[in-house]
Amino acid sequence: MEVPENIKKRVTIPFEEHFYAGHTACQGCGASLGLRYVLKAYGKKTILVIPACCSTIIAGPWPYSAIDANLFHTAFETTGAVISGIEAALKAMGYKVKGEDGIMVVGWAGDGGTADIGLQALSGFLERGHDAVYIMYDNEAYMNTGIQRSSSTPYGAWTTNTPGGRRHFLEKRHKKKVIDIVIAHRIPYAATASIAYPEDFIRKLKKAQKISGPSFIQLFAPCPTGWRAPTDKSIEIARLAVQTAYFPLFEYENGKYKINMPNPKKEPKPIEEFLKLQGRFKYMTKEDIETLQKWVLEEWERLKKLAEVFG
């Protein structure tokens, strides 16, 4: 169906689709929506590298695929290495990489394949300065293998190897600040994004496309299956993660920080509003919630100071 021109003028999200219906994601999957936005932003002239993760399955079983772009499946820990090699090979053959008329080399990996098992390859990619974009879709656990904790799993969360109940083995470590590790490499561009704010996400994808050198985006992508949440609440949960400052939106560009919160002067909502929609937090005690709230507000104040000093 043709989209009316008056609607096109009001919407900044591209209308073209390169991620099609019929894929095998769970209902309410945040990762599949995020991947759809990536392909809307970059189009068919994209080489997408996906390691072992949910998105490998979502893309479709051979010989079918829901993705209308070049797709390279690779081993769990190798995303950073593979996008480095593809970018180097394209340049050696004389192709333009990055830019609006260049080939986009994109790594698309989960938090387990990035923050944990793939951290070494990610660091090498960043340090060498390759012209590619690495996107970590953050659903805060190893969802494809059975909802095991990752270093991106938040304090107080239930997973299959941090179970709740009477023995109370919930996750007792705070979420790893992967974006800080990335920024420590002094790359030109890094950002956080959320599926609840698609225009902000696509703007950041477009900026990463234009900037020479490596770019990194950490995308908050709820998993209703692993988070024990209603499938129709993924966007609301993602929005509350931002509104509570649990997952603030910001950019780091050439040494400068910029906060992208929808209402930057508004005080964050209580963390309980984010937690109560998810069954993975149902075992948290009052003290657990207070501990997480304290950490969230401390990290939020730290980010505001960084933006103030290095903005």
UniProtKB/Swiss-Prot annotation:
It is an enzyme of class 1 (oxidoreductase). Gene3D superfamilies: 3.40.50.970. Keywords: Oxidoreductase. Its EC number is 1.2.7.7. One of its GO terms (biological process) is organic acid metabolic process. It catalyses: 3-methyl-2-oxobutanoate + 2 oxidized [2Fe-2S]-[ferredoxin] + CoA = 2-methylpropanoyl-CoA + 2 reduced [2Fe-2S]-[ferredoxin] + CO2 + H(+). The keyword Nuclease does not apply. InterPro entries: PorB-like (IPR051479), THDP-binding (IPR029061), TPP_enzyme_TPP-bd (IPR011766). GO terms for molecular function: 3-methyl-2-oxobutanoate dehydrogenase (ferredoxin) activity; thiamine pyrophosphate binding. Heterotetramer of one alpha, one beta, one delta and one gamma chain. This is Ketoisovalerate oxidoreductase subunit VorB. It comes from Pyrococcus furiosus (strain ATCC 43587 / DSM 3638 / JCM 8422 / Vc1). The gene is vorB.
